[in-house]
Each structure stands twice: as C-alpha cells, then as structure tokens.
Amino acid sequence: MFMGEFRHSLDSKGRVIVPAKFRKGLGDNFVATRGLDNCIFVYPMNEWKVLEEKIRQLPLTKSDARAFSRFFLSGASECELDKQGRISLPSNLRDYAALQKDVVIIGVSNRVEIWSQEKWDNYQQQAESSFENIAEEIVDFDI
C-alpha cells in the first residue's frame, strides 16, 4: 500500500527521484499514465494488469468507454527505476501534468501519483475546505 507525500525536483532530463518508501512496492517495472485531475498515475505491474483487464471489459459500443480507454491507455508507458532510484517521465506525461521543476509524489493506496507542486497545493487547498462534507457524503467507516 502506498501512502505519504514527498516533494522532489524534476531534473533537466525529465527524471525524478521516487521515494525509497515506494520503490519496493513499484517493483522493477511499472506503468505511468495520464491520471485524473491532471496528474500522473503510476501503477505496479500487478495493479496495472488488473486495471487493464477492467478497461478491456468496458463496452466497445459506448463512446464514453472508448474515449476513456483511449485517454488512459494511449498515455501509458512502461517504466523502470535507474540505479539512483529515479524514473524518467516521458515528455507527453510531463506536458499533460504540467511538470516543470518542483513535483509532489503521493501514495494513494494501490497507486502513486505525481503532481506539479503548484497544482497539488491548489488541489489540496480546495480539498481541505470540503473534506468534511465529502466524508459525510461518501464514506461510512462505521466509527
């Protein structure tokens, strides 16, 4: 399970250090793709295969299903860590997520997300103001 928030910098070659805490969970090969909210989703290969199968089951006759499949899968790239624990992010993903220099890498259960620091800070500020309302509407932890 991935959790936590880490701030790093993108180097001039489009590489970013993956937090040591996430490296083992991602494994040797993993997949990065366009995520929701203009961030990059990074999945360990086993999680990617589960997600890919679910996408494959979407009805081909539905235009929204085709659009989602195209968006999600066409942006996907198989990645690996270099010896320094960095991931080289393809330019199409860096452009999509508006990654410049400062990035935030967060753990979200079965995936890692990579955000531009500016977008993450804005998102977090908005989310904090509505967190309690969202929790009341969708979450029932029976606590």
Curated annotation (Swiss-Prot):
Cellular compartment(s): Cytoplasm, Nucleoid
InterPro entries, per database record: MraZ, MraZ_C, MraZ_dom, MraZ_N, MraZ_sf, SpoVT-AbrB_dom, SpoVT-AbrB_sf
MF GO annotations: DNA-binding transcription factor activity; transcription cis-regulatory region binding
Span of domain SpoVT-AbrB: 5-47, 76-119
GO process terms (BP): negative regulation of DNA-templated transcription initiation
The name this protein goes by in its record: Transcriptional regulator MraZ
Pfam families in the record: MraZ
Keyword GTP-binding: no
Disulfide bond annotation, renumbered to this chain: none
Cellular component terms (Gene Ontology): cytoplasm; nucleoid
Subunit structure: Forms oligomers.
Similarity annotation: Belongs to the MraZ family.
Keyword Transcription regulation part of the UniProt annotation: yes
Domain of life, per lineage: Bacteria
UniProt keyword list: Cytoplasm, DNA-binding, Repeat, Transcription, Transcription regulation
